[in-house]
């Protein structure tokens, strides 16, 4: 009887809440409609729901996520409505979604002060990442950006010695895979990209890498931190997956939580806090000096920002935000670049021929510099086209901090302004915008780097956001990706995709990563011939870049001067 009464009470509470939400939503909608008429705004198309409060919208989003088709489903929603801006409802909240360049420019620039990142992202990220540059608003955001921006100058990106060290670790890993015919018959490049970028990112941030690549080599001996390095990398990945699922619930992100997620957060915090305490006690430089010698003094991001603030929680938060940007965006972008190139042997050869001409062969390379990488047009086109088709942040959102408007999307023709009430969310999808055929042509879904020849773009192309919160580290991300691409194409004369699935999966955590992996078959070239000697091939593939001028990486056994690092998400 008690169980029956309790169940009845629960049903009554749930039913009452749903009725309250429906009535409240109706009253608010009427109030917003009156305000919209006052501002001479018209309604955009509305995505109809089958269930109350748009519960079916949440279920559809979760199903698309599970099927690894979330960005594809967003495109279909726009196509079904035949609009570039529409209103939708999810768990009672009525939001706007747009893929209109003019609206996105308004949100990110023209009316920047009308929109915040908002409480949803901040509340979602807080348990793991804290409140840093990607979640803060107002004065807190200005403070974070002021601390971080000076750390990403051209001096930091132009020295590529650190990157060569981690590229050589990659080459040591793939060396044993080379067969007697000079081919690596099967390799998934994606996990190698993630290991490379987390190693280089953590070395830049903390002064030493987590050595996620080296731990796979025979005879590797870990540092005093031991398994904590590996546990950190695993926890950082699993924690991001939880954050991504929470984000599907939007304002109700708190509905998704677990002990496993909280445990991941603790592991991540404990690892970073170790380095923060070293920096605050002035012990970080001494620790790094014990493991690195020779050359100029190593730049350490944590040490630099610790000179600006001594708040340990703030330091940890900013480190984790930059790590998210510096590791995941670059690795994901590299995955999409090689996904595209491996499926297009003609363009792979075209890019490789240009790289050999401008940067030399793997055995006889010329100098690879920041300036030369930026000046390599076709390499830039390949990066731009991959970011157009597969932007690392395919959808983003802002919250209105006051009643405001967007210039387009309302009325029958979609050209009237629309009303954005205070507290509502406006999503903007660059993934959809980057594939609009009315902007990019009928071949918008095709990988075609040549389309960038002579093309000037504005707000229709936003791989790194725009306005005051534009990504301050986009050059770092592009230079690192370009450097790794050059070295791999110098090494592999051919690359064939082994993924025959026409459906491309999207593993959308906080970053859009290819779910299929980058499974390829690749051949190693040596002086234009394929060697038949395994040992010779493995020696060649592990050969470090020794450049001809003063700023050259030293052989692998030497200690390298270090400085610089990637990053990638908009702040």
UniProtKB/Swiss-Prot annotation:
Its cofactor is heme. The chain crosses the membrane at residues 8-28. The keyword Metal-binding applies. Heme binds at residue 471. It is a single-pass membrane protein. Pathway: Mycotoxin biosynthesis. It is found in: Membrane. GO terms for cellular component: membrane. It comes from Fusarium sp. This is Cytochrome P450 monooxygenase g430. SUPFAM superfamilies: Cytochrome P450. Induction: Expression is increased upon exposure to hygromycin B. The keyword Transmembrane helix applies. Cytochrome P450 monooxygenase; part of the gene cluster that mediates the biosynthesis of 1233A, a natural compound known as an inhibitor of HMG-CoA synthase in the mevalonate pathway and with antibacterial and antifungal activities. The highly reducing polyketide synthase g433 is responsible for the 1233A backbone biosynthesis and the cytochrome P450 monooxygenase g430 catalyzes oxidation of the backbone. Disulfide bonds: none annotated. It holds the Pfam family p450. Belongs to the cytochrome P450 family. Its EC number is 1.-.-.-.
